[in-house]
């Protein structure tokens, strides 16, 4: 990925960066419009996820997470920007005439060939079951339920590793540090998700952040007591509590957000590192 750094010509472009190689020209039969409902609100219209709202209109790109074009070779035709995710996407032309989008594997270039199946080479971009992969393989777009399509490791730069296979299960180490079990029959794609340097980009101005649908962040300590538990006081007053809290009064640091008694609790061997 080539990141272009703007020269300091105006305050809005000072130190702003943009990817100078990836463009967006989606195919009409692989996109559709969608309403962006809620924007951080629940069904009652109450804010549950703060600092979201606005943003530019988006067209959703249909991504092939299942990779069910078995044993048919495809060629990477374009590498495109997708406004719905921080990873890039590739347009694939398959030998039978099918055209689909997939997540862009790191290092893949236009003209490379990919394939999915049970006995395919361990090559970047190929999709195959975990049982056919050697230990230590870097993978992404991992299925949790057989045939449902990839659900894990789809963000830019994500790269879990296959560290063990025993019985009917395979052990994966996820980017978060979590170690969990998954059925060996589930499929995954070889390689790392592209656009690794997405966290090194500088938007350069507030307007670019608003285009992404992200609203300003205000500290609770500078609010009024009616708006936040940290608010109020004379001058630069402390929060007035033993521990920081959310706007709704719950502990802000260290509180577990995972639901209790989930079916997958027995599949997680080690919780993610904070």
From Swiss-Prot:
Residues 1-25, 223-274 are annotated as: Disordered. GO terms for molecular function: rRNA binding; structural constituent of ribosome; transferase activity. It holds the Pfam family Ribosomal_L2. It comes from the Eukaryota. One of its GO terms (cellular component) is chloroplast. SUPFAM superfamilies: Nucleic acid-binding proteins, Translation proteins SH3-like domain. GO terms for biological process: mitochondrial translation. The keyword Transferase does not apply. It is found in: Plastid, Chloroplast. The keyword Ribosomal protein applies. Residues 7-25 have a biased composition (Polar residues). Keywords: Chloroplast, Plastid, Ribonucleoprotein, Ribosomal protein. Transmembrane segments: none annotated. Part of the 50S ribosomal subunit. Belongs to the universal ribosomal protein uL2 family. This is Large ribosomal subunit protein uL2cy.
């Amino acid at each position: 990925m080539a990141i272009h750094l703007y020269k300091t010509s105006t305050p809005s472009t000072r130190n702003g960066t943009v990817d100078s190689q990836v463009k967006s020209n989606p195919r009409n039969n692989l996109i559709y419009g969608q309403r962006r409902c809620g924007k951080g609100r629940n069904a009652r219209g109450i804010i549950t996820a703060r600092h979201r709202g606005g943003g530019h209109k988006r067209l959703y790109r249909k991504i092939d997470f299942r990779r069910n074009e078995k044993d048919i070779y495809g060629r990477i035709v374009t590498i495109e920007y997708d406004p719905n995710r921080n990873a890039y996407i590739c347009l694939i032309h398959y030998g039978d005439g099918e055209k689909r989008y997939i997540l862009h594997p790191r290092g893949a270039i236009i003209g490379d060939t990919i394939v999915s199946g049970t006995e395919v080479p361990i090559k970047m971009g190929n999709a195959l079951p975990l049982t056919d992969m050697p230990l230590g393989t870097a993978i992404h777009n991992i299925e949790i339920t057989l045939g449902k399509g990839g659900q894990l490791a789809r963000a830019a730069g994500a790269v879990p590793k296959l560290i063990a296979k025993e019985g009917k299960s395979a052990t994966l180490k996820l980017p978060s540090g979590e170690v969990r079990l998954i059925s060996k029959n589930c499929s995954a794609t070889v390689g790392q998700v592209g656009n690794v340097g997405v966290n090194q980009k500088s938007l350069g101005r507030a307007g670019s952040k608003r285009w992404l649908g992200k609203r300003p962040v205000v500290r609770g300590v500078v609010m009024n007591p009616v708006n936040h538990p940290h608010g109020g006081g004379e001058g630069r007053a402390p929060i007035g509590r033993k521990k920081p809290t959310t706007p709704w009064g719950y502990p802000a640091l260290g509180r577990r957000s995972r639901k209790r008694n989930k079916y997958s609790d027995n599949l997680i061997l080690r919780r993610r590192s904070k």
